Amino acid sequence: LHAHPSPQLRRQHDTLTEDLDLSYRAQLAGWRFLFLSDVEVPGEIPVEINGFKSQQHRWTKGAVQVAKKLLFRIWRSDAAVKAKVEATFHLTANICYILMLLMALLTLPVLNIRTHLGWERLLIIDLPLFSFATMAISGFYLASQRALYPEWKRQIKLLPMLMAMGMSLCINNTRAVIEGWIGYETPFLRTPKYGVTNATHAPHKPLYSSRRTVLALGELGMAAYFAYALYQAWHTELYMGLPFLLLFLTGFLYTGLLSSTQEWLSRMRSEPQPI
């Protein structure tokens, strides 16, 4: 497709996620894709936390760029309405990071309001809301693990940390969403591959230092914020919110500390060469 004679199917460089852009343009041009669940494509998540955040920033911003570029064309196309709706949800899903950050920042004000409400209102409003949100995310990841691994039940214990890590990305990815919507251009930063297969291998030299300190300070600041919120919830006996607050605290603390200290830790290990 990159060398296709049609201009609509040639490689274009106006988004950070060219594969996502091209796949949507191909479908708009009449191509149909077949998903083969038994075909696996090897992948590697960056072993550096700052590399991981850089990758997530690129994917998030790229999806927003594709949404700006193609959503109007998608809705003007002859595709089925359900396909248009699904494409809209798919391409705009990252807006949730802005909402997640706002929700995080409003935690203390909400806790203060909740102290004046009875437990009956907490059961009616908070419990169903948090339960459905948690069940939706958990169900999505459990379904993927069940499809990938025969012993998928072993992965359940990793779900809380996975959710905490996802929450901690809200600062990093909110910036990506805003940059994508306002048209702020940034270069494509390739994620180095090291062929890492176990925890004893990690890159010696840090590869992602840009804005690392500012983001890490923001994440550590949010960790301190949620530590205080956790204390307030315990002090005011709002015990139902403790697991939710603990997830945010764990995620921000882990990501912030690792972003700040991985450069020092990596120097204590051997350096594999990028592939």
Show which residues each predicted segment covers.
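Loop-to-transmembrane boundary segments
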Residues: 76-99, 195-227
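Cytosolic juxtamembrane regulatory segments of multi-pass membrane proteins
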Residues: 163-177, 200-206, 256-264, 275
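Transmembrane alpha-helix/helix-exit interface in multi-pass inner-membrane proteins
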Residues: 101, 168-189
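Juxtamembrane inter-helical linkers in multi-pass membrane proteins
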Residues: 158, 185-203
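Repeat-unit-sized solenoid/scaffold elements
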Residues: 56, 60-63, 67-69, 128-133, ...
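Juxtamembrane transmembrane-helix termini
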Residues: 71, 107-117, 179-182, 186, ...
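Non-transmembrane catalytic domains and loops of membrane-associated enzymes and transporters
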Residues: 1-159, 163-173, 267, 274-275
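Alpha-helical transmembrane segments and their immediate juxtamembrane interface regions
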Residues: 139, 143, 211-272
